[in-house]
């Protein structure tokens, strides 16, 4: 029995690794749409079509529950997929939810009016598509008032990480943090709104300074998934565990192995 985890590339492996540590008894089927990565520079409709195709593939492989471990896909496709209707017995969840829960300190099912929260100035680092969608600001506004969000589109970071060029990735992160701080000099919290970015979390933290609380998604998503499966144990599905890619399996396997520093072997989707 496996839970599906989908990402446009390798960033979702940070979510997968946290979920495996939190839920060692659960099997996971990871699906990377490497042939079409990165999603962050694509149009919303393109992202939706690609995401929907991948999620349906995972459902057909027996993964009744699919996690969109990609903020760009969550921002552009999740709500539309849910509005179009999800097949009976199937679920698709996004990675925005745990971030909003952590920042506002309220559960997703809490539909009470928005209220003030402790954090007032929030820096959001995300892909150009996620920033353009304003999905994070929209969901936050449903739950909190008086929060100023300054978003920074981090062009190039995902490409550098996917290519294994961490020196370039670090330089880009520091450049984007500098650009953000010119707009918001003193953020209280920072959201790493892309599942690739936890690999660069120490760099973000160093560039932002020790007084800024950095919210990263891996452990937050893993905790929320554990809670969800406890409430819905039948959603583990009948799928088999493994790693699938729409790209070249050997190339993706090599990059994933470098990414997580342990052997990862992908098969063709």
Swiss-Prot record:
Enzyme Commission numbers on file: 5.1.1.3
Lineage: superkingdom: Bacteria
GO BP of this protein: cell wall organization; peptidoglycan biosynthetic process; regulation of cell shape
PROSITE patterns to which the protein is assigned, alphabetical: ASP_GLU_RACEMASE_1 (PS00923)
Catalysed reaction, written as an equation: L-glutamate = D-glutamate
Gene3D superfamilies, per the entry: 3.40.50.1860
GO molecular-function term, one example from the UniProt record: glutamate racemase activity
Cell wall biogenesis/degradation in keyword set: yes
The entry's keywords: Cell shape, Cell wall biogenesis/degradation, Isomerase, Peptidoglycan synthesis
InterPro entries in the record: Asp/Glu/hydantoin_racemase, Asp/Glu_race, Asp/Glu_racemase_AS_1, Glu_race
Pathway(s) served: Cell wall biogenesis; peptidoglycan biosynthesis
Chain ranges passing through the membrane: none
Residue positions of the active site: 70 (proton donor/acceptor), 194 (proton donor/acceptor)
Pfam families noted in UniProt: Asp_Glu_race (PF01177)
EC top class named in words: isomerase
Residues at which substrate binds: 7-8, 39-40, 71-72, 195-196
Membership in a protein family: Belongs to the aspartate/glutamate racemases family.
Functional summary from the UniProt entry: Provides the (R)-glutamate required for cell wall biosynthesis.
Protein name: Glutamate racemase
Gene: murI
């Amino acid at each position: 029995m496996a839970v599906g985890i989908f990402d446009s590339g390798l960033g979702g492996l940070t979510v997968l690794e946290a979920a495996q540590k939190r839920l060692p008894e659960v099997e996971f089927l990871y699906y990377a749409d490497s042939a079409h990565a990165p999603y962050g520079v694509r149009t919303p409709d393109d992202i939706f079509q690609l995401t929907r195709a991948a999620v349906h593939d995972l459902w057909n492989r027996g993964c009744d529950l699919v996690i969109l471990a990609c903020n760009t896909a969550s921002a552009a496709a999740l709500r539309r997929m849910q509005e179009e209707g999800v097949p009976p017995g199937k679920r698709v969840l996004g990675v925005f939810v745990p971030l909003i829960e952590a920042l506002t300190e309220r559960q997703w099912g809490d539909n009470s009016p928005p209220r003030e929260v402790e954090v007032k100035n929030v820096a959001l680092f995300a892909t150009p598509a996620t920033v353009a969608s304003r999905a994070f600001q929209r969901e936050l506004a449903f739950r909190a008032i008086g929060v100023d969000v300054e978003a920074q589109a981090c062009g190039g970071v995902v490409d550098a990480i996917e290519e294994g060029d961490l020196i370039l990735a670090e330089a880009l992160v520091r450049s984007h943090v500098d650009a953000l701080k010119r707009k918001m000099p003193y953020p209280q919290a920072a959201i790493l709104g892309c599942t690739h970015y936890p690999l660069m979390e120490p760099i973000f933290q160093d560039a932002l300074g020790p007084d800024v609380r950095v919210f990263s998604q891996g452990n937050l998503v893993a905790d929320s998934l554990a809670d969800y499966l406890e409430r819905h144990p039948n959603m583990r599905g009948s799928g088999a565990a493994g790693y699938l890619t729409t790209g070249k399996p050997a190339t993706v396997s090599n990059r994933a192995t470098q990414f997580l520093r342990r052997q990862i072997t992908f098969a063709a989707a």
